[in-house]
Amino acid sequence: MANIFTAGPARALFFYGQQLIGVGKTLSETVFDSSITGEEVRGGPGNLLYGKYFHDPNLNIQITDAMFNLQYVAASLGVDVNQGGVSLYESAKAGETVGASGKITLTETAVAFDGAILAWYKKPADDDWTVATVSENAITIPSAKTGDHYCVKYFYQNMNAKSITIKAQYVPKTLHLVLINDLYSGDVANVAASTSKYGRLITDIPQYQLDGSQNLSWSATSAATVSLNGSALAIDDGTSCEEDPIYGTMTQEIFGAKWQDDVKAVAIGNADIDLAKSASETLQVYAVFGGGVASRMMDNSNFNFTVESGGTSASVNESGVVTATTTAGTAVISVTLKDAAGEATDKIGYANVTVAN
């Protein structure tokens, strides 16, 4: 296997149910932290170590995005984003013009603030603001003259905005998280490839429980970042008859790679077959990868099947179905991998077929 390395923050996909609520392309940090507690099993003279019992496995992930996203904050607080929200109207540079009787008609419909519908005004040159009660969506300024200009502020409902409710007690959302990290070549003989993407590492966490912490820090010398830290929750993937919960999966994808090139040998699960005359059986062919990679039964369309000897007793078709003839005897079937690098004989398996009298 070629030497590879991974560097840089991941890209992230955040799903809530089937809805894609965010794509993290500007993450500044992604930390994948798995841990487990091991208890030593000791006993006997000298209190020897006989084994370890492992418990409390954790998979924690830290994610920091350099860009602000209200959806991320909402997910941390366990709420949904709503269309529309309370906004603050602030006069433009020219201010608002006073009409007859010292009245200024508000551009937007003011809403209540602390139980009353209020607005605040001042002349551009003044420092202090004066509060006024809004009546019929207008304010009256005593002693103001028609044509005077005032700065005005008030709250109104802006349907073009988006808002969230910050609850006093909340449960952070559980998302489906997918992290995508770039892989690069680490081979000395392949320096050019080390500067470009060689592949990618895809981490899939179906149940990602956010920890609910959010620290938006604004300062004069930095931008506020959004965090989406959390932990993986165990799920039963349903692929086994036994309860075998998982936290997720991690997939290494090398661009241009073929699984056939990683096969070290071909093995046949039913390599010794006993058949009655005219009976048939399908070969079960496994690709042996080696290097700690589990062998896997592959579809027979990936292999070539040939009768090497005993053709009078058995035949095999392109789908790997062995059929006995009416002649008793033995036959040898060879199985070779298609589209594999090297000689065909490098990756070959055999099945022995016995046809009963």
Where do the protein language model's features map onto the residues?
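Solvent-exposed edge beta-strands and adjacent loop segments
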Residues: 1-77, 128-129, 199-227
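Extended beta-strand solenoid/passenger and fiber regions
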Residues: 70-132, 156-195, 291-292, 299
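Low-complexity "stalk/linker" and mucin-like segments enriched in Ser/Thr/Pro/Ala/Gly
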Residues: 132, 296-298, 304-320
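Extracellular/luminal low-complexity segments enriched in Ser/Thr/Pro
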Residues: 139-145, 317-329
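Mixed-charge, glycine-accented linear interaction segment located at domain edges/termini
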Residues: 142-144, 201-262
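Extracellular recognition modules
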Residues: 153, 286, 334-336
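Short S/T/G/P-enriched beta-strand
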Residues: 257-284, 288-290, 343-357
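A short beta-strand micro-motif common to beta-rich folds, especially ectodomain repeats
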Residues: 328-341
